[in-house]
Amino acid sequence: MSNSIHFSLIAIFLLLAVCSDVLAAEPASVVAPIPNVLVLGDSIYSQSTNNAASILRGRVNLKFATMQPGEVRNTHNALENLNDLLGDERWDLIHFNFGLGDLVYRAPNMKTFRVLPKTAGGIRTTSPALYEKNLRALVTRLKATGSKLIWASTTPIRHSSTGVFDMASEIEYNAIAARVMMEHGIPVNDMYSHVLKLIDMEKPAAHGADPFYFDRKPLYPPIVLSVLRQLDLIRPVRGPVQVFIMAGGWSHIGGGIVIDSVQPRPGQNRGTLDHLVLEGKNAVEYRHLLDQGGKWKTRSDVWIHFDRRGPKSGALGIGYGGDRKRCIGSELSFGITLGEHIEKQVCIIKTALGTPSLVSDLRSPSVGGHGQQPGTAYTNLLKQINESLDSLSDKFPDYTDDAGFEIAGFVLNVGEQDGDSDLYGEHLKALIADLRTDLKTPQLPFIIVGTGRGGRDDTEFPSIIQAQQQVVSLPEHQGNVAFVETRDFWPNKDARDAYRHPSNERWFDNAESFYLMGKAIGDQMIKLLP
C-alpha cells in the first residue's frame, strides 16, 4: 500500500470519528407526550367527552370513565368504585362532576338503586350535608393521585315530567361544591352557566329525566377550554381569523368514501380515498394527506365547522363530508389549499342546507315582489353563519376576541335542483349582492362552483352552467367573483359501471372527484384574495 493511500485512509477514519462525536453530541429531538385526561361524571358527559376528544385529538387523550347501562352515578358509588374508575393509567388531569345522581329521588330502603318520584315516596339520594362530606372525601382521594383536577358545576335542572327532580335544587349543591373546591384550590368549569345560556328553562319536560337533555345544545365547549387552560395548551392564533363559508347541495356536502377513519386501509376499491393515497396511479400526489405514522393528517392552521346531523368542529381533516366519520367533500382540499397560501388562521364554516334550489329555497330578499319573504334555505344559511361566528370560541378553543375574524370568501355550489336558466341567472346575481349586504362585506370574494354533475356528456345542466358563467362575467363581478369548472372531475368510469355504485347525485361517492373539485375551488379563491 502506498503512503498516500495509507494517509488517505487514516484521514477518512479520523473524519468519521469526528463526525460520529458530533452526531452523538447532537441532542435528539424530544416529542412531548400527549397528556392523558379522565372525565368522571354521569351520563351527560359521555357524548360530550366524545365531542371534546374529537376536537382535542393530537393534543390531549381524553377518556370518559364508562358506565354500566342504567347506572346512576353519584358521590356514593363514585367513592365506592373510585379505584375502578381511575384504572391503572396515569392521569395528567381529572375533570369531574357528581350532582344529578345525588339530587334524583330514589326508592328508600333498597340495596339496588331505583329512581322513584317524590310523590310516590321517593327520597333524595344525598342530603346536602352528606353531599359535602362525600365531596371532601372524593377530593382527598383524587388529589392523592397527583393529577391536576377540574371540578365541573352541576348543570341546571328544569321541569321533570316524572317528578324525580326538584327544579333548581342544584343551586344549593353547586354552592357547597364551590366552597369545597375553593378551599382545595381546585378550578371550576362552570357548566351550570354555560348550559343556562343555551336552554329554555321554562320549556316543559319532554323526557322522563329532563335534566339529562339539553335541546341538542353542545355541552363540550367548556370542557375543551378548561382542559386546555389547565394543561397550559392554549395556542394563540394569528388573526384576524380568515373565515370562508361554503354552501350548496349534495355536490357541496360530499360523499367521497373513506374506508378507515384513522388510517387508510390497503386493498380498497378505486374511488375511495384509501385507494387514492396508497395504490392510485397518482398516489404520490396524495401522500401529504398522511402523517409520518401513515394516519390521516389534520392541520391546526385550518379550522372547520359542519353541522349536519349534529355539530362537528375541529382541525381540518377527513370526516366533514356527508358521513361525519368517513367521508370527504370539497372542503378537505379547499382548506388545504387555503392553508398553504394564507399565513393567518383559516376557518371554514360548511353549512348544511339539504338540497336547495337557488330560485325557490335560496331566494334572496331583493328578488320577487314587495313583501315576499326570502327562501327558507336563505334564512337558514344566515342563521347558521351568524350562530357559528357568534360562538367561534366555543368551537375553537384557541380563538380569542383579541384575534378577531373577518369573512374572507364565499363558495356556492347550487344548481342541480334548478331548471330555468334565465331565472337562475337573475337569482344568482341577486344572491351575491344580498349576501354581501347581509354579511357586511361589499367586495366579498365569491366562487360559483359549476354544476358539473354528469360530466362533459351531460345534457341536463349546460344552460345552468352558461347562466353561472354569464353572471361571473358581469362588469361588477370582475376580480371578485370566479367560476370553477367541475365537469372534468366527473368519474366517468364509475358512471359507466353505475349499477355497482351509489346514486350519480352523489358523484358516485368518488373521493377523487371531491378532492379535485375542492383543489380547483381553492386555487380560484386564492386568485380573488387581496
Where are these regions (language model features)?
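Short, solvent-exposed loop/turn and secondary-structure capping segments
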Residues: 50-51, 106-109, 161-162, 253-265, ...
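Active-site segments of SGNH/GDSL-like serine hydrolases
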Residues: 97-101, 110, 136-171, 359, ...
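Structural recognition of the beta-strand scaffold that forms the well-ordered cores
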Residues: 36-39, 62-66, 92-97, 149-153, ...
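Conserved SGNH/GDSL esterase-like catalytic core that processes O-acyl groups on lipids
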Residues: 24-133, 228, 267-399, 404-405, ...
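Bacterial N-terminal signal peptides
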Residues: 8-21
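Catalytic His-Asp segment of secreted/periplasmic serine-dependent ester chemistry enzymes
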Residues: 154-235, 452-529
